[in-house]
Amino acid sequence: MAKLNTKHRVCSRESSISSLLASCSLSGSSGCSSDGSFQYKDQLYSSASEALQAYIDDFDLSRGHPGANTDKVNIDGEVGNGPHFSSCVLTPNNALANLDDKRHFNPLYYRRETINDMDSISLTTDDLLRLPADGCFSFSHVTSDHRQKKKSKKYIGRQDSLDIKDSPSFYAPKSKDNTLPPYVYTNINGKKCGDKIELLILKAKKNLKQSTEDLAKPVEKDDSPCSLDKLEAERTWENVPVTFKSPVPVKADDSPQQNSRTKCLEDFLNDCNQSSTLSGGKHHGPVEALKQMLFNLQAVQESFDQNKSTEPEERRKQVSEDDFSKLQMKENMIPITRSLHKALQHLSRLRDLVDDTSGRQSPKM
């Protein structure tokens, strides 16, 4: 043990010994020896450090050889069989006789007394191994009455935490930050519940049950939109009836002039379709259209010549004016007549050219 202590921590000999073995008390004895000597394995040591060093050497031998045993370091000469140091502070029967009542009930007084009187504290081997390297550690005076109360509180807390499962309701006071303070769980009777982990588990289970019940209730009342029946049902919002109204002609009550124009256009288109069948094809070319125009003009001219020979000149003037007015009306009514008028002009020029060429050729003959 001494080798391990030198390897893992470096500290002074006096500080470690004074902190580790400030005092040694016996579990079976009621006091300390008057001469202040320490006995270990039938040997008396004048100081605690020598007894502790002997104990450490035996402990190292016992670790190397499991068959070896170590005894207790005793003050009054008793020898034990196990490496056990008493962890409780023992006082003589008349130790509190001369103390004042205020000192007896003041924990700070006992804390100062234990720190000042280091010989009244004993440690076990495990406690010695857990000490820091510098050897300093803090002590707190714990009386036997306090330990008994603490054990009873622990037992009551465990019993109450187990009984909480059977109790129908319990509450846990919360702080300002909505956090549960440790060991402040109480039930209806006001008893403290020490085991907060079980309370949290029970509370979580209760919340889960409530959430599942709340989710199950609306599903039972109203059908879920994610169910197969709802998905396979007809979607009324997609089959919206659409009413189609018959088209209403715009400006149905037009003037009689527009009606006459539409009739003239229809008649002209019908005549064009009939002439295209006579010319030998539905889609006639421009030459065939000119031929049709020439034929029509020749027929009009022949009829005009016949009327000219029979009627007087005044009648001719009236007829020419009427024809001219009719042509103007046709030009105004049908836009296509403009192109026809231009074609007539071209044809008249062609006819004049033909007549001129024929007149020039006749004198030569």
UniProtKB/Swiss-Prot annotation:
Q: Which GO terms describe its biological process?
A: negative regulation of cell population proliferation
Q: Give the residue ranges for region: Disordered.
A: 304-328
Report the residues modified as Phosphoserine: S161
Q: Which Pfam families match?
A: LAS2 (PF15792)
- Keyword annotations from UniProtKB, A to Z: Phosphoprotein, Secreted, Signal
Signal peptide span? 1-31
Source domain of life = Eukaryota
Give a Gene Ontology cellular component term annotated to this protein: extracellular region
> Which residue intervals are annotated with compositional bias (Basic and acidic residues) in the record?
308-328
**InterPro entries for this protein:** Cell_Prolif_Regulator, LAS2
Where does it localize? Secreted
Role according to the record: Might play a role in cell proliferation.
Q: What is this protein called?
A: Lung adenoma susceptibility protein 2 homolog
Organism annotation: Rattus norvegicus (Rat)
